[in-house]
A protein has these predicted regions:
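Hydrophobic faces of well-ordered beta-strands that scaffold small-molecule active sites
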Residues: 1, 62, 146-150, 335, ...
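Terminal catalytic/cofactor-binding subdomain
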Residues: 1-137, 142-144, 159-162, 176, ...
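Loop-rich catalytic cores of soluble enzymes, especially ATP-dependent carboxylate-amine ligases
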Residues: 104-334
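Extended, compositionally biased non-globular segments
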Residues: 273-334, 342-348, 354-362, 366-370, ...
């Protein structure tokens, strides 16, 4: 969620927000605890959600706890998401701030002073910037996605991943919301997704950029997927000394001689240095390192998982050699897995949309990306046939077209119409209303990016141009459109 000053529209790092958020939740009788980092509160944990920060104090994120699916599942998730949004908007008032309905702030600095001021002090960033040479500050202007997570059986994991990757152009076009950067039109409807070549292009290891490029072909199974991710030519990220899931904050070790993860796992031990104190250590390869490294790619979708029981590393490596071997092993180990969709830009109901499309469409904005992905994965065989019909390589080209032109491109619009048809067929009738926003965008040809550009161009030459966006494009409290 892109935080903006409620009077000027400027990018605005939060200060008192988390204390205020705890108070808002406690006043409703919700138990919560603060999440601390370097003696500063960077999040609030409740049973229903994790409310925290992405890479900067100017970019909030909320991750809801998993909910049971089935008929009405999206409505239940939508009610929770709107409750969390309401809490966020109320707490932001303490900082004189609001959420701007954009997937990237329209005019935010990215210089060294701003980066030092607003970047969250996570240990992982020392490795990414200081060792790997990422231009991490490219994303410090609050680039935001509406990440959607849908559980899938492990036997269908690779198929589901291929579906979401292959059909990403439709989600990019439907939920495009970042046409502006540094106070100027970028020529893209979804400029947010230009981030990866800019972050990785100057990086120390060419393999980092490889893991953000649309794959040359679909993945045959999970073994194929992880061979692609951990292959020679890539370089392992730093690895934990013990098994834990807070990968952005855990002490880790940078391996000497920069091996790929595949080479490290086949060695009994590897020398390296701790990222927190520089101490030389030996790291013994373990199945936890395979599980930990799942976040190492930056495509439009990831397979995310946890294993109830970690297998012995030799057993994992043996299973990895055989087609379907990881799927079978993970099932035995009690896998809990889902597809993380990363293509949709962040979007919220604002006054512009409410005035144009009405309350039913406004209420569906938060859930529409989830409805598209859930519908496709519930109808995965038809969705995979759609990928085959359109051709994998051609779909990769359309992804770039969707970033630039959105639904103005006839091919992207035709693909999107077919994607929504397949998704609709995969949803229970009770959840079909969650596609209302996606339907509206397709039928009108106007995404949030188009609506934002109309307002922006209409106030050209005004010194307070950012402030003039707020009446139409600040996220509305759900009370305004019947979301609560």
């Amino acid at each position: 969620m892109v935080v903006a000053h409620a009077q000027t529209g400027a990018s605005h790092p939060v200060h008192a927000y988390f204390d205020a958020l705890r108070q808002v939740k406690q006043d409703r009788g919700v138990a919560c605890r603060p999440v601390m980092l370097s003696d500063r509160c960077v999040g609030v944990h409740t049973q229903a959600a994790e409310c925290g920060l992405d890479n900067g104090f100017n970019l909030l994120e909320t991750a809801t706890a998993p909910l049971d699916g089935g008929p009405g599942g999206l409505a239940r998730l939508g009610a929770l998401a709107h409750r969390e949004l309401a809490d966020t908007l109320e707490a932001l008032q303490v900082d004189g701030a609001c959420v701007l309905n954009v997937a990237q702030h329209p005019d935010c600095p990215r210089d060294a002073d701003w980066y030092a001021r607003v970047c969250v002090p996570r240990p992982i960033y020392r490795e990414l910037v200081g060792y790997r040479g990422w231009h991490h500050w490219i994303g410090i202007d609050a680039k935001a996605q509406n990440g959607v997570n849908v559980a899938v059986p492990v036997a269908r994991a690779a198929l589901s991943l291929n579906v979401v990757l292959g059909l990403a152009a439709a989600s990019i076009a439907l939920f495009a919301n970042s046409p502006l950067e540094s106070g100027k039109s970028t020529g893209f409807k979804e400029n947010r997704l230009t981030i990866w070549p800019r972050v990785f292009g100057p990086a120390r290891f060419a393999g980092d950029a490889l893991l953000a490029k649309y794959p040359a072909r679909p993945f045959r199974d999970l073994g194929d997927y992880f061979r692609w991710m951990f292959q020679p030519g890539t370089v392992s990220r730093s690895l934990p000394l013990d098994h834990r899931y807070d990968y952005k904050s855990a002490p880790t070790v940078i391996l000497d001689r920069d091996p790929c993860l595949m080479d490290f796992l086949h060695a009994s031990a590897w020398p390296g240095r701790r990222t927190d104190n520089g101490q030389a250590v030996q790291v013994s390869a373990h199945a936890m390192h395979f599980e930990h490294s799942q976040i190492g790619q930056f495509l439009d979708a990831r397979w995310r998982y946890r294993l109830e029981t970690l297998p012995p590393l030799p057993v994992l490596l043996q299973a990895w050699k055989h087609e379907g071997g990881l799927e079978a092993l993970f099932a035995e180990c009690g896998v809990d897995g889902y597809i993380e969709g990363r293509a949709p830009g962040a979007g919220f109901a604002d006054a512009c949309l409410l005035g144009e499309a009405g309350g039913d469409v406004a209420r569906s904005v938060l859930m529409a990306p989830m409805a598209v992905q859930l519908g496709l994965l519930n109808n995965a065989d038809a969705a995979w046939q759609l990928v085959r019909d359109w051709d994998w390589e051609r779909l990769g080209e359309l992804r770039l077209t969707a970033m630039r032109d959105g639904l103005a491109d006839a091919r992207v619009r035709a693909l999107t119409a077919e994607v929504l048809s397949v998704a609709q067929a995969g949803l229970p009738e009770a959840d079909a209303p969650c596609l209302a926003y996606a339907r509206y965008v397709l039928e009108s040809g106007r995404s949030a990016a188009d609506r934002l550009l109309d307002t922006w161009n209409g106030v050209s030459g005004c010194e307070d141009r950012l402030a003039r966006l707020l009446p139409q494009h600040a996220a509305l409290h759900p009370d305004r459109f019947g979301g609560l």
